């Protein structure tokens, strides 16, 4: 362990969407999960943690219930998760995750955003070496928790990085993507309240840009954020120190 500082900074690399966008993302994920593995959270561990994450984000219960119900509706479109990779202007690497019911539309839109700002859409996997994919759980810290002891326990459950945020009294754990289920199992069985659980991509290195370049890149990233099919956007722009 030892990359907690870089991981904390990397959270800023993921574009944080407004509530309406976040709720739309949760709705799609909940519907897809319920459709794939069942609508009963007691028997669908992934759905259970998605619901907990949505609630922590302030998503209304009736909105969550509608998303689950959509999974049993025959008229509900089948969403497919598709990841796009490409270079934006100034050589910035960008990974765009989507959930779409019309891949032709989504490909055309994503390609147009890259092209409009002087970038280019690459082939699948072309940027995999620039990012590390992780499973991330954030839980409420228990009173008097011994972080050293917790860290030692979590190593056996696939966690390779852990840090505590004293400001909001939470603990965030990072592990390999295939350790997601066992990480969830540990936190649930040991009585931790799960605030959020997700997969993320952490840039292995970041690239400095000028203020003018950052302004252009922000416009491109905003275009991705505004697209209803887009669920997550990751990049390797160095964090603005100001």
Could you say what each language-model-derived stretch is?
Residues 136-242:
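Positively charged, low-complexity, intrinsically disordered RNA-binding extensions
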Residues 1-113, 118-122, 127-136:
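N-terminal cationic and glycine-rich segments that engage phosphates or anionic surfaces
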